[in-house]
From Swiss-Prot:
This is DNA polymerase. The keyword Cell wall biogenesis/degradation does not apply. It comes from the Viruses. Residues 1868-1878 have a biased composition (Low complexity). Residues 694-709 have a biased composition (Acidic residues). InterPro entries: DNA-dir_DNA_pol_B, DNA-dir_DNA_pol_B_exonuc, DNA-dir_DNA_pol_B_multi_dom, DNA/RNA_pol_sf, DNA_pol_palm_dom_sf, DNA_pol_type-B, RNaseH-like_sf, RNaseH_sf. GO terms for molecular function: 3'-5'-DNA exonuclease activity; DNA binding; DNA-directed DNA polymerase activity; nucleotide binding. The keyword Nucleotidyltransferase applies. Gene3D superfamilies: Helix hairpin bin, Palm domain of DNA polymerase, Ribonuclease H-like superfamily/Ribonuclease H. Its EC number is 2.7.7.7.
Length: 1878
């Protein structure tokens, strides 16, 4: 009979569901319980014919574990319109519990193959056949035999079923035994599986559906979520029952109907009746079903009788349960349904009747025929139900479930979910440093809120345990509501101080506005939009006295007055905020727990509460015996071992009996090295047992009893047990390993785990970590209360004697911040969306349950295909592959670890000569599962494949490798640990042996069913999840257009859930079956390879590839100069445009970006779609789709997943793309970012000189700093270990100074904040740092910090990242000439003789050969690596670097290598020995100051790009080709065009006379004209654009289209620019042409010679000098002539023009003529003979001077001329004095200056200064022996006297200092002379 529903009286809202534990179930057992009878009547197949359970369970136990729904009467109210104000009952609707009976936990046991043949119904080989198993008694007996001898409890019956297994589902259904589990003590799937493995040969060793909860199965069957509405069948009237502490109702599951929008009238579908008849008939006709003639006859007769009445069956509303019941009953009849033993007699009788109807006599009817009929009826029933499920999902729901229904269902779920009650809490304890006193909970603050319906808290309560030092009377004055609330409000309101001040300061500096109200308008607009602060309506009005702020501080104070609150803390004393004081801790905890239980919570939130707050509260409850809780005692087993890990807490968060199940942190993956170690140990142990049997007793005497049995942590634990007995348990130490706690009724959500690792606010200079303080500032702009009274060390004092108000406020603010972060991250709404899609309650989403969650998603698809859920407890003994005695077996392939996706090796390098395009497969792994139908369900067993046609499946050959370990010791060697002539003791056998391994290729042919046979579960899941995601993203966009913010948030959470769920499918397949996982990755690799093959043909070889992506270079569109290119094609963009647009001078950026994009889009289309008209098929099956992801125009590829690039965006913008760098990982520091990001930017942009200088400066500063830090930490550690706890700060500071520490780099820049794991057994650097901190400050390990400050050494911070980049530069082999030069420099730097260098060369050559040989061996990488034919050639395609740069990089590597080795040796001696020599930079104070300023500036302010600049930013020469040509300089203002323009102000400045210094720019709207002009002076109201920075920083970008600044004028002092670094002021236009910016672009290397610069060929100069004077001429005069293309050289005989090229400050060529009028008559006199000496006599340049340039640079202010001569050697300086002109002539063979050509220079500098005669110059040879290394830029200058003085100086005294380690003395040499090594 159909269910009649009363929508008003029977509507219930449910928010959670669970299966209670047996104690909770036992509480609801009642003698008069009448539900048992109903269950008994409907489950007769579970009980024997006598009415008693054949497994021994009583009838009451039959139904004592119901599903428990938490419900409330009626529906939830609509979401509030005002989210900032709560109205209603804080506890929400009255709740009770609905006990739903009739469903049981079930497992499926798969029968062996001999039971699957229906033709063997008479077979009794195993005492049973498949017909026998239709009988309850036979099934029960067989299961009992399988469970014999095992402690298996709680199974109450069985049932024979016909279902598909999870693996090889496409092979068809199998007979299984369904085992029903119930009772107080139930068997786990793990126990059953172990039992089957040990005892049974009738069942496969699998337990299906073990991870599917009963309520998940129920919800999936009903298509209902874990949150929603339900109704109870009218007339049932269960009635609300009163329990001791809660109300409840009892119902049967069949009496419940969900509001799931899954009830339809099937007749609305055209032809549905005929479809159903055909569906039922097709089951009989399927050739794989193989039904007998009797079954076919009977079913066809039933279908004929069904046809006339089917219209009535489908004409009324049906949900699936009703529909299935009607169809099965009409087709099968009641007697045949389920084929239970009760009906077997009638079934047999009916079979015989049918045979008679077919004309077969009774005596001819064989028993085998009848049995086969009975078994086939069972098969048909299950196949019918499966077909009806598929029909319902695909035909009915797919057509009748509308978008309106879907939206209503989603909105209903979110309406309920957003109103669920959540409570956040935080505790304080009475911790005292260096004290063993028992810690107590002193304060608890609770904030009640909901999951998104309101922005504000609902209610707050503070529970305070009064200290004994205070009286209850004194609390009236010591603790007041108003003061606490005011302190909380003040902290929240003042939290934005830092952000406000930073923004205001920058805005004021740029605008100069204090007296304008516009700055406040700008400020309030920004803060309201970015931070959603509430502001008074009159915020923009000034005070009554009309006084305006006149400074940043006044402006800040004014703004703060206008801010109401950042968020509403909603603390109204007596209304929604209450403080409760208690005399005892126990009273306080009881009140707190009562409040929690009364609040009807769904979620309990906290910050690190799972690992601290909750365990601490539970520990105190156990100590105080609250609620009968007892202290935990570790279980001791019969073998003497102890259970060290606690499994559950007896804490109730509701009024029902409950437990908190502990989920510990999972261990990481086991490395191959561990497998190898385990296997070899096992192998050696077995050998020892055989070889040393007689020596066991002797060996045992020598062994320690714990050796080899326990790891270090277990040994420590065992030692504690010996000392203190078996009850030793350290609850808070164990709590640190807890991942989460899971209750049956309330979820525990740790907000700290919800916070992403990469927090926002990249400009914040305070270290980022996941502490509450950092996270709150990152997401809210607010910090914790920072006051001395509430510091960690003083909290207890404040609680006892101090200001209680700030004590309470401190805890309250922490709780409020946690709540607000939780709301900001939308974690509650995400949980509601996730729970609804995975059919699990919210509480199960935080229990480290990714496996269960994904299996639940898959089960929702497996259910309607009649497939069981898989057994996830897969054990793969990978150790055995590494055993030296292992022999390969083909069946072992399934246990090999699948190989990963596509990788690429040997392509590291700098790719500046080509742009590259990164293609990416869209959701490749889900796409492979869909397109190739790869899934565990479609993977066919051999038996199933043999039954199919070859057209029904595809074969896939999957490659892999397995290891072959072999003994590597020389046979008979005395060093061999297996040489019995040497080894005499058992324990020594094999210990010192060497082992090596090789890999052997293997493959496996897997067969996957095609979609025509069955669509894979994984593919169907992914397809639907991705389709839903696309749908939700569309709805989100529509909601955004309509301004519905609530729907935007909801749909965003839903689409994120779909994405996460789809991505998790592959991980589950990889776990369940290695063959399936390997097939997916193999096909993905092949797709990548096929795409790369084509892209290589049309574009070029691959520079990158990673899993689902590949990146070819544009080999046919090189960016560097090629033979045949026009000489005017200067710069990569000019060349690229010339190749793309032949004949055009300068196309727009958008044009050639569009052309490149179109070109490569066509390549992708060819692969994705093929060319149908030409018969060219696509390269893969849809939905596989290769798309352009990124286009790079500069790339540095360091290694896999580790690169830096400049990315071209579709609109013509340029952005930075960074992947995998160390500066982005958890141990990131500012220094790492300054090392990698800055240097990689320099490489990509071609600033090679800056790279060398900056890298040298940075490393020199950091190696000194970090060495001193490490030495000081070592000294403190020794002191602490020896019991010295006083004076440690002074010791640390003194040690740092002794080791050269100079406060050059702020500590915050090289300190990381890292997670602390195991402090008692420290493994990571963070663990060790925190352990030392705890010992130093007397902090108990149990309450150690979760994150700590870590200062790592020079290698991880700078050395390793820098070396990796350096090696990338050197990846390309040098030319023969470069090899010769580099070899000579190596000899000089390393002080090697020719013979020593030859040996070193041979060593390196041998090393390369070994690497080459090793690479030729078989290895796992061979499976995944991109074929060599598709890779770039590093020696052809990487950027070649000039000799000068290569030498600089090699010298830097030598410097790093020396430093790291020296510091390592010092570290090994605890820094008693001093072996490290300070870098040369430390000896030159002027250079040190310069380097420090520049490096600190780079660390503080460097940004790769603060916004997306136009692409031509990458190449200024592209701008220069489109300079605004100014012909009439008399006009004051000049208008810029509104197009893609980029104005280089230097190039405008060079066209003027030299004296005008200023360029002015007028700010205007983009729609108007932008103007600029040149002036001799500036007005007071103008704002100076001043830049002394090296690279573009955020402060350098000024907008020129700000409507609030219209009419303002910026100006630049160009003479100031002239003295700065290689800077270029530019005005750039954004790609969308809507904005203009004034920016500054520069380099790191300083060069003051900006104005007067030219280059002359050496040979040209030699000829000119010989023609312009006598040999005896003392001077030659060089004059640039205005408007001419050369330099006039004047001698005594004649004068003439010498052809030259004028250059800019950065080495780039200027227009051919000299531009500076006023410098026309100023000549520079150069001593002729000295110049000739430089050109002819220098050994280093004698052979190259005729082929290279001299470069002359003039400094207009100091009138200095520098002549640079190219050479390839390091720096030497020679000084001498010219008496006639009183000039100092300085000849530098070194690094003074830059050039495009690259290489070392010889520089001559003439300075017009009078100085004393310098001392005698040190001869060249002797000077070179002063050090092994000479600096790249400014080496110290040593005279002969300097050396003598150095030789005669007595040795510096070694200072003995007390290290703090018990008076032990160590030597530290003070004041090492700087500059003696680098």
């Amino acid at each position: 009979m159909d269910m009649e529903i009363d929508d008003v009286d029977n509507l219930w809202t449910y928010r959670s569901v669970c299966m209670p534990d047996y104690k909770d179930a036992a509480e609801i057992i009642r003698p008069e319980f009448d539900m048992t009878k109903r269950i008994f009547n409907q489950r007769k197949h579970l009980l024997g014919m006598d009415g008693h359970c054949s497994t021994g369970m009583t009838m009451n136990e039959f139904g004592t574990r119901p599903m428990v729904f938490t419900v409330s009467k009626g529906c939830y109210p609509d979401l509030p319109t005002d989210k900032d104000k709560f109205v209603g009952d804080p506890q929400g609707p009255k709740e009770l519990y609905m006990h739903v009976y009739g469903r049981f936990d079930t497992y499926y046991l798969d029968l062996q193959n001999e039971f699957q043949d229906i033709n063997n119904v008479m077979n009794t080989t195993h005492d049973y056949n498949i017909y026998d198993l239709l009988k309850t008694g036979a099934r029960t007996a067989m299961v009992r035999e399988a469970f014999a001898g095992a402690n298996i409890h709680g199974w109450l019956g069985t049932k024979l079923v016909y279902k598909r297994p999870p693996q090889s589902s496409a092979g068809g259904c199998r007979f299984m035994v369904k085992v029903y589990i119930a009772g107080q003590k139930t068997a786990s799937a793990y126990q059953i599986k172990n039992t089957l493995n040990a005892t049974s040969n009738r069942f496969r060793k699998k337990v299906y559906n073990s991870c599917v909860q009963t309520y998940t199965d129920f919800l999936v069957a009903k298509n209902a979520g874990p949150i929603g509405e339900m109704r109870i069948k009218k007339g049932v009237n269960p009635g609300v029952k009163k329990g001791a502490k809660y109300d409840y109702v009892d119902v049967h599951y069949r009496d419940i109907e969900f509001s799931n929008y899954d009830t339809f009238v099937l007749s609305e579908i055209d032809g549905v009746g005929e479809d159903l008849i055909n569906l039922a008939t097709s089951i009989l006709n399927n050739h794989r079903n193989n039904f007998d003639i009797l079954t076919k006859t009977f079913i066809k007769s039933r279908l004929k009788s069904l046809a006339p009445i089917i219209g009535g069956l489908i004409g009324s509303p049906n949900d699936f349960t009703k529909f299935k019941k009607k169809m099965v009953m009409y087709i099968m009849t009641k007697e045949f349904k389920n084929c239970m033993e009760y009906y077997l007699t009638e079934l047999r009788s009916k079979g015989i009747q049918l045979y008679h109807a077919l004309g077969i006599k009774s005596e001819d009817v064989k028993e085998e025929y009848v049995r086969t009929f009975c078994v086939n009826m069972l098969r048909y029933q299950y196949l019918l139900v499966m077909s009806l499920k598929e029909f319902w999902v695909e035909k009915v729901r797919g057509k009748l479930y509308s978008a309106v229904m879907a939206k209503e269902k989603e909105m209903l779920t979110q309406k309920i979910g957003m109103q669920l009650r959540t409570m956040c809490f935080d505790i304080e304890t009475n911790f005292v440093p260096h004290s063993d006193a028992e810690q107590q909970v002193t304060l608890i603050h609770c904030v009640l809120y909901d999951e998104g319906a309101h922005n504000c808290p609902i209610e707050q309560r503070t529970f305070h345990y009064k200290a004994e030092e205070r009286s209850m009377e004194s609390l009236k004055t010591d603790l007041t509501y108003d003061k606490v609330v005011e302190l909380c409000k003040k902290q929240v309101r003042d939290g934005y101080d830092l952000k406000m001040k930073e923004w205001l300061t920058r805005t004021v500096e740029q605008t100069g506005m204090f007296k304008s109200k516009k700055i406040l308008s700008l400020f309030f607009e920004k803060m309201m939009t970015e931070s959603k602060i509430k502001i008074h309506p009159d915020s923009h009005d000034y005070d009554a006295d009309n006084s305006e702020p006149k400074s940043v501080e006044e402006c800040l104070a004014f703004c703060k007055k206008r801010i109401i609150e950042v968020f509403d803390i909603c603390m109204e004393p007596g209304k929604n905020y209450f403080i409760y004081n208690f005399k005892t801790e126990k009273e306080m905890l009881l009140a707190f727990l009562k409040y929690v239980r009364d609040s009807n919570l769904t979620v309990l939130t906290h910050y690190n509460g799972d690992s601290f707050d909750l365990p601490f509260v539970i520990n105190r409850c156990e100590k105080l015996k609250i609620d009968g809780m007892k202290e935990y005692t570790p279980a001791t087993f019969s073998d003497g071992s102890t259970e060290t890990k606690r499994r559950r807490f007896q804490l109730k968060l509701t009024h029902r009996h409950d437990i908190l199940t502990i989920k510990y942190k999972k261990s990481g993956k086991v490395a191959d090295s561990t497998h190898k170690k385990n296997a070899i140990n096992s192998y050696l142990e077995s050998k020892r047992e055989k070889l040393f049997q007689a020596d066991d007793d002797d060996d045992d005497d020598d062994e320690d009893e714990d050796d080899g049995l326990l790891d270090e942590r277990q040994q420590d634990s065992a030692e504690d047990m010996k000392k203190k007995g078996p009850n030793v348990y350290r609850p808070m130490a164990e709590a640190r390993n807890i991942f989460t706690l899971q209750s049956n009724f309330v979820a525990s959500r740790d907000v700290m785990k919800m916070v992403p690792d990469q927090a926002p606010n990249v400009d914040d200079k305070i270290l980022k970590d996941k502490t509450l303080n950092s996270s709150a500032f990152s997401f809210l702009g607010i910090r914790k209360i920072d006051h001395e009274a509430v510091s960690y060390a003083n909290l207890c004092k404040t609680w006892k004697f101090g200001d209680l108000n700030i004590f309470v406020a401190y805890c309250a603010v922490d709780t409020l911040l946690t709540m607000k972060i939780d709301q900001t991250l939308k974690t509650g709404m995400n949980a509601v969306a996730t729970a609804s899609n995975v059919y699990l309650p919210i509480r199960e989403l935080y229990g480290n349950q990714a496996l269960v969650r994904t299996l639940a998603i898959m089960y929702s698809y497996q259910w309607y295909k009649n497939i069981c859920s898989p057994d996830p407890s897969v054990f793969k003994n990978e150790d055995r592959f590494w055993n030296p005695e292992y022999v390969w077996k083909d069946d072992d392939f399934k246990d090999l670890k699948p190989r990963a996706g596509r990788t690429i090796s040997n392509v590291s390098g700098v790719y500046n000569s080509f742009f590259s395009v990164l293609f990416d497969f869209n959701s490749q792994y889900p796409g492979v599962m869909i397109s190739e139908n790869v899934c565990v369900s479609t993977l066919l067993d051999k038996e199933d494949a043999d039954k199919m046609s070859k057209d029904d499946y595809v074969e896939m050959t999957i490659p892999n490798v397995y290891p072959k370990v072999r003994h590597a010791c020389e046979p008979g060697s005395e060093k061999c640990g297996m040489n019995l002539e040497v080894v005499k003791k058992k324990k020594d056998y094999g210990l010192k042996c060497k082992w090596t391994q090789e890999f052997v290729m293997c493959e496996h042919i897997a067969k996957f069913a095609k979609k025509s046979v069955m669509e894979g579960i994984a593919g169907e899941c992914c397809k639907n999840l991705l389709a839903k995601r696309k749908h939700y993203k569309k709805l989100m966009a529509e909601a955004a257009k309509g301004g519905n913010h609530t729907e935007v948030v909801i749909y965003n959470q839903l689409q994120l859930v779909m994405k996460v769920n789809a991505n998790s499918i592959f991980g589950i397949l990889l776990l369940l079956d290695s063959v399936t996982g390997g097939a997916i990755t193999h096909e993905a690799r092949m797709q990548n390879e096929r795409g790369s093959e084509y892209l290589k043909k049309v574009s070029g070889p691959m520079a990158m590839a990673d899993t689902d992506s590949t990146a070819p270079i544009a080999e046919n569109l090189p960016l560097d100069w090629q033979p045949g290119d026009d000489k005017d094609d200067v710069g990569p963009l000019n060349r690229l445009c010339r190749r793309l647009f032949p004949g055009r001078k300068r196309p727009k950026i958008s044009e050639f970006v569009h052309k490149i994009d179109t070109m490569y889009e066509s390549y992708g289309s060819y692969l994705n779609d093929g060319v149908p008209e030409k018969g060219i098929p696509p390269a893969w099956i849809k939905p596989a789709n290769l798309e352009i992801e990124k286009m790079f125009i500069g790339l540095v590829f360091i290694k896999k997943k580790n690169y830096y690039a400049l990315k071209m965006l579709p609109g013509g913008e340029l952005a930075t793309h960074v992947a995998g760098l160390a500066c982005m990982k958890s141990d990131k520091t500012k220094i790492k970012g300054a090392t990698q990001l800055v240097l990689l930017k320099m490489l990509v942009e071609g600033d090679y000189e800056g790279y060398i200088r900056y890298a040298t400066d940075l490393f020199s500063l950091m190696v000194v700093t970090l060495r001193a830090e490490e030495a000081s930490k070592s000294a403190v550690k020794m002191a602490v270990e020896n019991g010295q706890l006083e004076g440690l700060d002074e010791l640390e500071e003194k040690t740092k100074r002794d080791f050269g520490y100079r406060d050059l780099i702020p500590k915050v820049y090289y300190t990381s904040r890292e997670k602390v794991n195991s402090i008692e057994n420290p493994k990571t650097v963070a663990d060790k740092m925190e352990q030392l901190r705890c010992k130093r400050y007397g902090i108990d390990f149990s309450i150690a910090a979760t994150v700590t400050d870590v200062v790592r050494g020079i290698k991880p911070q700078v050395g390793a990242p820098l070396t990796a980049i350096n090696n990338t530069i050197l990846i390309r082999e040098p030319t023969e000439e470069q090899k010769t030069i580099e070899r000579e420099m190596d000899m000089r730097w390393m002080a090697r003789s020719f013979r020593q260098q030859t040996r070193e060369d041979n060593r390196l050559s041998d090393k390369k050969e070994k690497i080459k040989k090793k690479n030729a061996e078989v290895k796992p990488l061979d499976i995944t690596d991109m074929p060599d034919r598709l890779k770039v050639d590093q020696q052809v395609h990487t950027t070649p670097f000039p000799t000068r740069i290569r030498l600089g990089v090699k010298k830097l590597n030598n410097m790093i290598d020396y430093s790291e080795k020296a510091i390592t040796k010092e570290r090994d001696s605890d820094f008693v020995k001093e072996l490290f020599h300070q870098p040369e930079l430390m000896a030159d104070e002027e250079e040190l100051q310069r380097a420090t300023e520049q490096v600190v500036e780079m660390i503080e302010n460097f940004k790769s790009f603060s916004l997306h600049f136009p692409l031509f930013w990458y190449d200024e020469r592209y701008c220069i080709s489109n300079i605004l040509e100014l012909e009439d300089l008399d006009e004051v203002w000049h208008t810029l065009p509104n197009d893609e323009s980029c104005v280089d102000l230097w190039n405008m400045y060079k066209n003027l006379e030299y004296e005008p210094r200023y360029i002015a720019v007028k700010v205007g709207k983009m729609g108007e004209r932008l103007q600029m002009a040149f002036f001799d002076s500036v007005e007071e109201s103008w704002m100076e654009y001043k830049c002394t920075n090296c690279y573009i920083f955020k402060e350098n970008v000024w907008s020129l289209d700000d409507k609030n600044l219209a009419g303002k004028i910026y100006y630049m002092d160009m003479q100031e620019y002239e003295k700065q670094t290689r800077t270029t002021p530019l005005i750039i236009t954004s790609p969308d042409k809507k904005k203009r910016y004034l920016v500054n672009r520069g380099s790191y290397v300083r060069n003051k010679n900006n104005a007067f610069s030219f280059k002359i060929k050496n040979e040209t100069l030699m000829n000119a000098m010989s023609q312009t004077g006598d040999v005896g001429d003392k001077y030659l005069t060089f004059k640039p002539i205005y408007g001419k293309a050369g330099v006039c050289i004047i001698g005594s005989k004649s004068a003439g023009m010498c052809k030259s090229t004028f250059i800019r400050d950065d080495g780039r060529e200027m227009p051919a003529t000299w531009p500076y009028k006023r410098l026309n008559n100023q000549g520079i006199k150069i001593p002729r003979q000295k110049l000739l000496k430089i050109m002819n006599d220098s050994l280093e340049i004698r052979n190259i001077h005729n082929n290279h340039n001299l470069e002359f640079s003039f400094d207009s202010k100091t009138k200095n001329l520098t002549i640079r001569v190219e050479t390839a050697f390091d720096e030497k300086r020679i000084k001498f004095y010219d008496e006639s002109k009183q000039e100092k002539l300085e000849i530098d063979i070194g690094t003074n200056g830059q050039t495009q050509l690259g290489s070392f220079y010889t520089s001559v500098r003439i300075e017009n200064k009078v100085e004393k005669k310098p001392k005698e110059v040190l001869p060249e040879k002797k000077q070179s022996t002063l050090s092994h290394f000479v600096g790249m830029s400014s080496a110290p200058k040593f005279t002969q006297d300097d050396v003598v003085k150095k030789k005669r100086a007595p040795k510096r005294a070694a200072i003995d200092r007390k290290s703090g380690s018990g008076g032990k003395k160590s030597k530290i040499t003070a004041g090492k002379t700087a500059g003696t090594m680098f």
